Amino acid sequence: MECLRSLPCLLPRAMRLPRRTLCALALDLTSVAPPVAASGRRANLIGRSRAAQLCEPGRLRVAGEVHRFRTSDVSQATLASVAPVFTVTKFDKQGNVTSFERKKTELYQELGLQARDLRFQHVMSITVRNNRIIMRMEYLKAVITPECLLILDYRNLNLEQWLFRELPSQLSGEGQLVTYPLPFEFRAIEALLQYWINTLQGKLSVLQPLILETLDALVDPKHSSVDKSKLHILLQNGKSLSELETDIKIFKESILEILDEEELLEELCVSKWSDPQVFEKSSAGIDHAEEMELLLENYYRLADDLSNAARELRVLIDDSQSIIFINLGSHRNVMMRLNLQLTMGTFSLSLFGLMGVAFGMNLESSLEEDHRIFWLITGIMFMGSGLIWRRLLSFLGRQLEAPLPPMMASLPKKTLLADRSMELKNSLRLDGLGSGRSILTNR
């Protein structure tokens, strides 16, 4: 009863409280319910304690704060448990390989990067963050530091042979890398760019023979009709070629963006800013920015060659498409011409068939009595139809013939001889004047 009496005083205060605090208080009030068989004194004490809790606004704030604190703890624990785990493969300067798993939060804290820097993107890019080089190549992500190379999440990829056989030897200097005398990041960048160029070259070498074989089969003049299965294969190969052209274009644009900015070239030389000895060598004679520019220009040239080869294939596909359309148009013209010839034959036959219609009427004449009249009339009908059909075909042939090129008007022989004689006279006059002048000058 005391609790009920205090409700009118507490309602205005409760309306000002947030909804979460009210829910917490409601759960607190209903969590411990007194038993039904409790004594009256115990019920009275419980009612007074609940009323005292309701009457103290400070307790309300504390309860709300405790509830919010518990919620934040639970959310942080949930986020920590759901944080992605990277499988990291580490390569040092000597080519030693170590693999381990690390959470994303721990990894970017160790590297001094932001969370957005380790976000996966399917677009090729080369960026520098906090003296770290981040290279993204569709499904491959690498972080290059002055001391090591980190490959992130190579799982479910066919990279084991390249990662564990070729890459360590290239980084340690045993491979055929041009940048072996330069700092470690040059070798790492060259190895990754070489791998990506080889991947694009492999895709092109697979597509090129398939496309050429399909085009040869479609453009072959021995086949009068076009095979639909070959067209479907050509369509699929054309889509793959378009994807390859897009990959090459993105690769070229990403490298060209770095080549256009001198600051980016300087930032890619991470050992220059972390190692004093490398900085002294760069200041003394070896310009690392120029070496990086030459390296990127070399791979840009290789990508440009791949782009030209892919463009040639695209031109061949377009030319073959026009040839296929021409062949289809010629076949369609042949069918239309045949249809027109049959129509003219039907017209000529029906025109002379009127003679048979006249004999089929119920008219009496003396011609039916002669047995030779039937064969005579039939012969006249077929001969007349054949003659008219031939005339119509000759008319159609004259109309469909290609027009001859205009003939050039030929000059008569007399004018040509006159022109030659005039040229000879002029040359003789010039020679005579020249000899006379020479004699005068000698005298």
Swiss-Prot record:
Domain notes for this protein: The GMN motif acts as an ion selectivity filter.
Chain segments annotated as transmembrane: 340-359, 371-401
Cellular compartments annotated: Mitochondrion inner membrane
Residue numbers on the Mitochondrial intermembrane membrane side: 360-370
Span of chain positions assigned to the transit peptide in the UniProt entry: 1-49
Record function comment: Magnesium transporter that mediates the influx of magnesium into the mitochondrial matrix and regulates magnesium metabolism. Also permeable to calcium, sodium and potassium ions. Required for normal expression of the mitochondrial respiratory complex I subunits. May play a role in maintaining the inner mitochondrial membrane potential.
Reported regulation of activity: May be regulated by calcium ions.
Membrane topology of this protein: Multi-pass membrane protein
Family membership: Belongs to the CorA metal ion transporter (MIT) (TC 1.A.35) family.
Annotated Mg(2+) 2 binding sites: 329
Key word Manganese present: no
Side Mitochondrial matrix, residues: 50-339, 402-443
Entries under InterPro entries matching the protein: MRS2-like
Signal peptide (UniProt feature, chain positions): none
Sorted UniProt keywords: Ion transport, Magnesium, Membrane, Metal-binding, Mitochondrion, Mitochondrion inner membrane, Transit peptide, Transmembrane, Transmembrane helix, Transport
Cellular component terms (Gene Ontology): mitochondrial inner membrane; mitochondrion
Presence of keyword Plastid: no
Sequence positions that bind Mg(2+) 1: 243, 246-247, 312
GO function terms (MF aspect): magnesium ion transmembrane transporter activity
The protein's name: Magnesium transporter MRS2 homolog, mitochondrial
Gene name in the database record: MRS2
Motif (GMN motif): 360-362
Subunit organization: Homopentamer.
